[in-house]
Design a protein with these regions (language model features):
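Non-catalytic, mostly N-terminal accessory regions of nucleic-acid modification and defense proteins
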Residues: 1-76, 83
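Flexible, glycine-/basic-rich loop-and-beta segments that form/coincide
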Residues: 58-63, 67-68, 270-272, 277-281
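Conserved S-adenosyl-L-methionine
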Residues: 74-188
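SAM-dependent methyltransferase catalytic-core segment centered on the flexible catalytic loop
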Residues: 115, 119-139, 201-202, 207-234
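Conserved Class I SAM-dependent methyltransferase catalytic core
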Residues: 157, 163-165, 212-278
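A short acidic, Gly/Pro-enriched loop at the edge of an enzyme's catalytic core
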Residues: 188-203
Length: 281
């Protein structure tokens, strides 16, 4: 409920329940407030009321693959938004050098590989319980046959074996581990792993200001990025707002500038999304 009203949300719930009971009174429909098959939703926004059915039955923003988690793991929806904000195209070469639990690379693989996030959740959809006269097995089979898992060039690197393992396991649960290359790689070795100007997009969630060696890490990160990133490539970072100026300072040292910037919220935490490009020298 959004807006100022002279009633409470519980009042709306009561009225909605009364309406449903009256509506289905003579239709041989069992109404059970605890053991239910169909969830009805009521949204009151200022002077308007929207009444509908929950077709999903579960939170569509949740990612079932997120089992092995880094303490500072990104939400899947935010990671996906970061990938799209970067300008990443499906056939491009993408690198996440601070992969943590792999969420950015996994979301990029979903997009680039044309693989549905909810592929393994089909049996959980609430609309399967609705009597719509639809053969849902045939419905999903028709969609599944279109899935090709297009070959991708996505690299998920971290300097700790633990998080490389986390990334690989989460990707396997997601069903797209074959679309990502996983490896334990130190920042200093990126110019050995990749040829000069061979990467289209670097997309990552770098270490925060709690790290004592942050200056050294960012300096090395932008130094390596300047070598492996194509001239028209981009670096897309998500960080705490308090770290953004520090990041920009090190980016400037290696001739990168901010081409666009946005603020996003993860719960009550404000995060900064910055997209960097190379300066024309």
């Amino acid at each position: 409920r959004i807006g100022a009203h002279d009633f409470k949300s519980v009042d709306v719930e009561t009225k909605a329940a009364e309406f449903m009971i009256k509506k289905f009174k003579n239709r041989n429909v069992k109404i059970d407030m605890k053991n239910f098959d169909i969830i009805f939703l009521v949204y009151v926004i200022n002077s308007k009321c929207y009444f509908g059915i929950d077709f999903a039955g579960f939170a569509l923003n949740k990612r079932p693959y997120k089992i092995f988690l880094h303490p500072n793991s990104l939400r899947g929806t935010i990671a996906y938004a970061l990938v799209r904000e970067s300008g990443f195209q499906k056939k491009e070469v993408m690198l996440d050098p601070f992969s943590r639990d792999g969420v950015i690379a996994i979301e990029a693989a979903f997009y680039a590989g044309d693989f549905p996030v909810g592929y393994y959740n089909k049996e959980k959809f609430a609309f399967l319980k609705l009597k719509l006269g639809i053969d849902f097995d045939r419905f999903f089979d028709k969609i599944d046959k279109k899935i090709k898992k297009t070959k991708t060039k996505i690299y998920s690197y971290d300097h700790l074996f633990k998080y490389v393992d986390y990334s690989r396991k989460n990707a396997k649960i997601a069903g797209i581990d074959k679309l990502i290359s996983f490896s334990r790689v130190e920042l200093e070795w990126l110019d050995i792993k990749f040829k000069e100007k061979s990467i289209d997009r670097i997309i990552t969630n770098p270490p925060t200001s709690k790290n004592a060696n942050l200056g050294k890490i960012y300096n090395e990160f932008f130094y390596q990025s300047a070598y492996i990133l194509k001239d028209n490539g981009t670096i897309s970072l998500i960080s705490r707002v308090s770290d953004s100026d520090f990041i920009k300072k090190h980016a400037e040292k290696h001739n990168f500038f901010v081409s666009k910037e946005n603020v996003v919220w993860s719960g009550e935490q404000q995060l900064n999304v910055s997209v960097f490009k190379k300066k024309n020298i």
